[in-house]
Curated annotation (Swiss-Prot):
This is Flap endonuclease Xni. It comes from Aliivibrio fischeri (strain ATCC 700601 / ES114). The lineage of its organism: Bacteria, Pseudomonadati, Pseudomonadota, Gammaproteobacteria, Vibrionales. Binds 2 Mg(2+) per subunit. Only one magnesium ion has a direct interaction with the protein, the other interactions are indirect. GO terms for biological process: DNA replication, Okazaki fragment processing. The keyword Hydrolase applies. Its EC number is 3.1.-.-. SMART domains: 53EXOc, HhH2. Residues 189-194 are annotated as: Interaction with DNA.
Length: 259
């Protein structure tokens, strides 16, 4: 039987639903809305296997902050009411047949990437439900990303239109241009336009740095900040080697509600 694994970036979905609620303390409304959303996702995707991946609630920013100490240092904590209601949300999703994977210090992005990559490498279909463009670097013929809220696929044509690059160049792009929302600096003075120019001419940061054809206007910046670009690329990238502790059979989707 063909496999179709659906991975829900749980907090990505929940936070968007929560922020749209008139009463931010009304967790029952969040449960009701996310349950309705999940049912629509199930109908649209028809998964054989499904799991919701949750970030840990702690302020520990993980291995990325060890490389770039400023990484997400100003991120806002989860609203207290939402944090207290997380168990109830997970319970409601469990009744729909969806198990939760809770990270223990790892960012959800890396757990999603590890599971998605592992299954896609066996030529099985994987759909990630998320608005996070960072997952686009994982794209492959059997791995796709669905932005549920914008009703669009974050696929290779989307990456080409949005960035002008191939999915496999995105980590290099962010290594050069940075990601301001996560405090990933990139190379100072190299913004999106310059990063695109460089990566249109060269496939990687290393190739650009090693080439005598790198435009002079960028040579000094590379000489001064090359190592920073490499570190920023690493932080913007996704790990696919996290120990998950379960197998695919454990997350098989069985239609119907659990008691």
């Amino acid at each position: 039987m063909a496999i179709h694994l659906v991975i829900i970036d749980a907090l990505n979905l929940i936070r968007r639903v929560h922020s749209a609620q008139p009463n931010q303390d009304d967790i029952q409304a969040v449960i009701t809305t996310t349950t309705r959303t999940i049912n629509k996702i199930l109908k649209e995707t028809e998964p054989t296997h499904i799991i919701a991946v949750f970030d840990h609630h702690l302020q520990d920013r993980g291995w990325r902050a060890e490389i770039l100490p400023q990484y997400k240092e100003d991120r806002k904590p989860m609203p207290e009411a939402l944090q207290k209601g997380m168990d109830d949300i997970q319970e409601a999703w469990w009744k729909l047949g969806i198990d939760s994977l809770l990270s223990d210090g790892d960012e959800a992005d890396d757990l999603v990437a590890t599971l998605a990559n592992k299954v896609a490498m066996h030529n099985e279909q994987v759909t990630i439900i998320s608005t996070d463009k960072g997952y686009c670097q994982l794209l492959s013929p059997t791995l796709r990303i669905r932005d549920y809220f914008q009703h669009r696929w974050l696929d290779a044509p989307f990456v080409e239109k949005e960035f002008g690059l191939k999915p496999e160049q995105l980590a290099d792009y962010w290594g050069l241009a940075g990601i301001s929302s996560s405090k990933i600096t990139g190379i100072p003075g190299v913004g999106p336009k310059a990063a695109l120019e460089i990566l249109t001419q060269f496939p990687t940061i290393e190739a650009a740095n090693e080439s005598e054809d790198l435009p002079k206007k960028y040579r000094k910046k590379f000489d001064e900040h090359y190592e920073t670009a490499i570190l920023c690329r690493q932080v913007a990238g996704l790990r696919t080697d996290i120990e998950l502790g379960f197998n695919l059979q454990d997350i098989r989707y069985e239609k119907g509600t659990r008691d």
